[in-house]
Structure formats: C-alpha cells, structure tokens
Regions:
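Catalytic phosphate/metal-binding cores of nucleic-acid and nucleotide-processing enzymes, i.e., regions
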Residues: 1-104
Length: 104
C-alpha cells in the first residue's frame, strides 16, 4: 500500500502550515495506523524536503502533537505487518473532531 499519494500531497499543500490555526480549522489530511497495537498517526502537515509529517499521535493512551517521518512509517514491520493508511479517511476531518473522539 502506498502511504503517500499525489492526491494526499496536494491536500497537504492546500492546507499549508497549521500552527496558528485553531484545532477546529486544522484538517487531518491522512490517518495511519498499525494493524496490531494502538498507535495512530493523524497527519496535519507534510514537508517533502524532509519526508516528515507533523501531526497528532495517539500511542497507548498518550496523545501528543509531534513530528514523524515517512520512512519510519514505511519500514516498521512486526510479524509481517506494516503501518497502513486508512483508505476510508475523510480529509475534511478536523483535529478537534479527532481529539473529541468523534472520528477515529
């Protein structure tokens, strides 16, 4: 599965930097998850020069904003399983909705 498509890159470019926006206006462009375990990466921004995302990371009940790399997502493998992109994710979902638990 391709984790980063041209369409997703275009959506990141349209949104731009989100630092000054309220959570209700920050669009979560892509959602990545590991099939076993509880880690979810909600990507808000993407820096193509660094192949790095900025987003909201949920891991074992600890939620934080931070950076994560595309390479990190592509190469993590446990028992033959890899990180996947949620193909049904709606990129108009806001960070506020994710934090409230309205969208998972």
């Amino acid at each position: 599965m391709k984790l980063l498509t041209n369409k997703i890159i275009e959506d990141f470019e349209k949104q731009g930097l989100t630092g000054e926006l309220p959570d209700s206006e920050k669009k979560v462009i892509a959602k990545y998850f590991f099939p076993i375990g509880s880690t979810i990466w909600y990507a808000l921004e993407y820096n193509p020069k660094e192949n790095e995302f900025f987003g909201y990371i949920v891991k074992s009940g600890h939620n934080e904003l931070g950076y994560f790399e595309l390479e990190e997502l592509e190469y993590v493998t446990i028992d033959g399983l890899r990180v996947e992109r949620d193909l049904d994710w709606e990129s108009n979902t806001t960070l506020e909705e994710v934090k409230r638990g309205d969208k998972e």
